[in-house]
């Protein structure tokens, strides 16, 4: 089974992430940031990953450290669960609409961290959640999962819809990329022979 459990303890946050890449979308989320839990639920359900997240952090200051460190820890868990990358599809992409909003996410398990994030949020907050933290979550993820990730909100008016379509598309693209290809069961998906 492709599973991982990762803990991250700093002076700012204490985080545990448990992940099953071949799950059914079950989730148990307690990040301490309610809107982040809502977005993590999108990743789990649309990626069909079993995901548990427990986090405590210095949210009395703001949510920055918790959101970023959950992204870091999730990235580490994905990298650990994938292992040597043999047999994975490697690339994934998804378009997701929600009413007036449309977002696209493309991912490559290249081993080269890179993030292109183009989401022109229409307001600064969704409830109490600072939408600027969305890029911090994904930056933490890519740097520790070792992926190239392109995120584009093509259109949208409602900032909640912008966030939600991004996270749903991310879950679906991630699911596609980590899917095992039985035709390439024991091979690395690269002409270099390594990723």
Curated annotation (Swiss-Prot):
**PROSITE patterns in the cross-refs:** IGP_DEHYDRATASE_1 (PS00954), IGP_DEHYDRATASE_2 (PS00955)
What pathway does the annotation place this protein in? Amino-acid biosynthesis; L-histidine biosynthesis; L-histidine from 5-phospho-alpha-D-ribose 1-diphosphate: step 6/9
Where is this protein found?
Cytoplasm
> Is the Cytoplasm keyword given for this protein?
yes
Record keywords, A-Z? Amino-acid biosynthesis, Cytoplasm, Histidine biosynthesis, Lyase
Enzymatic class: lyase
* GO cellular component terms, semicolon-separated: cytoplasm
What is the protein's major site of localization? Answer: cytoplasm
What InterPro entries does the record tag this protein with? IGPD_sf (IPR038494), ImidazoleglycerolP_deHydtase (IPR000807), ImidazoleglycerP_deHydtase_CS (IPR020565), Ribosomal_Su5_D2-typ_SF (IPR020568)
Q: What protein am I looking at?
A: Imidazoleglycerol-phosphate dehydratase
Q: Which organism is it from?
A: Cupriavidus metallidurans (strain ATCC 43123 / DSM 2839 / NBRC 102507 / CH34)
């Amino acid at each position: 089974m492709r599973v991982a459990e990762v803990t991250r303890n700093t002076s700012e946050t204490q985080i545990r992430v448990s992940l099953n890449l071949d799950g059914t979308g079950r989730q148990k989320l307690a990040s301490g940031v309610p809107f982040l839990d809502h977005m993590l639920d999108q990743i789990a359900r649309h990626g069909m990953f079993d995901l548990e997240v427990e986090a405590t952090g210095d949210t009395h200051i703001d949510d920055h450290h918790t959101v970023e460190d959950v992204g870091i820890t999730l990235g580490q868990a994905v990298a650990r669960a994938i292992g040597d990358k043999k047999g994975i599809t490697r690339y994934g992409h998804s378009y997701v609409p929600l009413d007036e909003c449309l977002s696209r996410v493309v991912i490559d398990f290249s081993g080269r961290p890179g993030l292109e994030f183009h989401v022109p949020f229409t307001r600064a907050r969704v409830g109490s959640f600072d939408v600027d933290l969305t890029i911090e979550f994904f930056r933490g993820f890519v740097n520790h999962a070792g992926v190239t990730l392109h995120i584009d909100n093509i259109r949208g008016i409602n900032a909640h819809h912008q966030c939600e379509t991004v996270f749903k598309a991310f879950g679906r693209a991630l699911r596609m990329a980590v899917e095992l290809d039985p035709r390439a069961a024991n091979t690395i998906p690269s002409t270099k022979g390594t990723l």
